[in-house]
Amino acid sequence: MADGGASSFIMLVTALLISGSVSTILISEWNKVARAAESDERKSAGSLGVSVDFAGDPMMVGFEDPAVGDDELTVYVLNSGIHEMSTTFELLINGVAPGTMTTSIAPSGTDWLPGYLLEITASDSSLSYTDGDDASLFFVGISESVQGYQHSATMNKEVRLNEI
């Protein structure tokens, strides 16, 4: 009878040691999961304040006819978010990237802050539009670093071209 009690005690101590080791591993892994979830939450919270919108009348987008002069299309994009946007972007006109693009920011001229406009003048010899043509614009831009992350913002707009 004495042997049964000692072996039961040894089994109890062994089970407690094993369960203690397992719980330590589980707590460590749970801590890693919690940190990853916190990082993802912080990253996604910053993306909520990043957005851009078309500025102006989509039925009156100015362009210059190549037959008359330079083939330029001028588009205004508003930083409608709460974070500063980078001037790194891509603009597609009917799915094609223009050969040359120049930009300016109003009113600052340098930083694309919330509420500021990015003026994009796109030109390409392959742009052959006439007054009243419709064009599909797609814009994607990135934010400056927000809590250590950069976020993208997109704009898709159907516009009507108006010869200047």
Q: What residue spans do the PLM features occupy?
A:
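Membrane-helix interfacial "entry" motifs
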Residues: 1-4, 8
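C-terminal juxtamembrane segment of a hydrophobic transmembrane alpha-helix
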Residues: 9-38
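N-terminal export/assembly leader peptides and their processing motifs that target proteins to secretory
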Residues: 28-164
